[in-house]
Amino acid sequence: MTQNYRITLLPGDGIGPEIMAVAVDVLKVVGQQFDIQFDFQEALIGGAAIDATGEPLPSATLDTCRHSDAVLLAAIGGYKWDSLPPHQRPEGGLLGLRAGLELFANLRPAQILPQLIDASTLKREVVEGVDIMVVRELTGGIYFGKPRGIFTTETGEKRGVNTMVYTESEIDRIGRIAFETARKRRGKLCSVDKANVLDVSQLWRDRITNLSQEYPDVELSHLYVDNAAMQLVRAPKQFDTIVTGNLFGDILSDAAAMLTGSIGMLPSASLGASGPGVFEPVHGSAPDIAGQDKANPLAQVLSAAMMLRYALDQPQAADKIEQAVLQVLEQGDRTGDIISVGMNLLGCRGMGDSLIKALAKS
């Protein structure tokens, strides 16, 4: 029986349209193989939306996304819009999208692919086999807590204030996603906080610990954030799934990403309690190579695989895409950002063609 899904495509800016085209081609092939029918709808976001409508997230785009099963986003931003006021820049489109879809969980995988292990700046024996998922709370914590702002004291001195706030319900909902994610992986969850100093982290640790009683099959551990950062570099293979707050997750997810040596290979997902999630590569819009057929589409393709796995419950189709990525790398196909001696240099379209051939063979 054919499964039907409505997918909103947000190509965005820079290399976005190029890498999105590859991901769509891959999804169409996998759809045929697994009897999945995709109804793709394209909408504007970021700089492209500013140029066309004057705002980074048109209401029509948000409405289209809300009526989708999932949203596949490519890239946002570029030099062209850097002179705009901060609240009018392309990046505001992504923040508005997350808020409008009520997305509170950001999933950032960091996996060392054996074909690219030498791209890491760490020793082979340290990073070989690393496969980490960072689950970051996305809508609370110090980035959104109030009071906030820069104030003038009675003595005329400037005083900057930000407030780190989490409620029980906010902690519980991100905790459940983290436990469920760990359960689907290797059954280990590390909660990262600063409970030795911060009251808000003490509540975080208490709630995560209480929640663990509902997941006896998941092994829970706790680390302070400073130690977690050190352990990520010292012995990253000890980690399976990490859950943490907004600020700590912002930092640790980027640190984990660079264990792989190529941020151009990394996908991500932003999820809510219900409704569509947003799936996108970690990398930026790379306006310096836009339109030159030099972009690496693999992170976009892997984001499509995450969409299949986490939004559409199609793990076999996701596996098929991930295996195709490994196959093209194994046969030596590379884009310019991951090229090494003896490998085959391909452009964005060429890498897409190679993926389609790999999917057809498997």
Curated annotation (Swiss-Prot):
SMART domains associated with the record: Iso_dh
Domain of life per record: Bacteria
Residues reported to bind NAD(+): 78-91, 284-296
Main location: cytoplasm
Binding residues for substrate: R98, R108, R136, D226
Gene Ontology CC terms, in alphabetical order: cytosol
UniProt-recorded Gene Ontology molecular function terms: 3-isopropylmalate dehydrogenase activity; magnesium ion binding; NAD binding
Pathway involvement of the protein, from the record: Amino-acid biosynthesis; L-leucine biosynthesis; L-leucine from 3-methyl-2-oxobutanoate: step 3/4
EC number: 1.1.1.85
Site label Important for catalysis, positions: Y143, K194
Entry-linked Pfam families: Iso_dh (PF00180)
Binding site for Mg(2+): D226, D250, D254
Substrates-to-products reaction catalysed: (2R,3S)-3-isopropylmalate + NAD(+) = 4-methyl-2-oxopentanoate + CO2 + NADH
NCBIfam families the UniProt entry points to: leuB
Family indicated by similarity: Belongs to the isocitrate and isopropylmalate dehydrogenases family. LeuB type 1 subfamily.
Protein role: Catalyzes the oxidation of 3-carboxy-2-hydroxy-4-methylpentanoate (3-isopropylmalate) to 3-carboxy-4-methyl-2-oxopentanoate. The product decarboxylates to 4-methyl-2 oxopentanoate.
The protein, known as: 3-isopropylmalate dehydrogenase
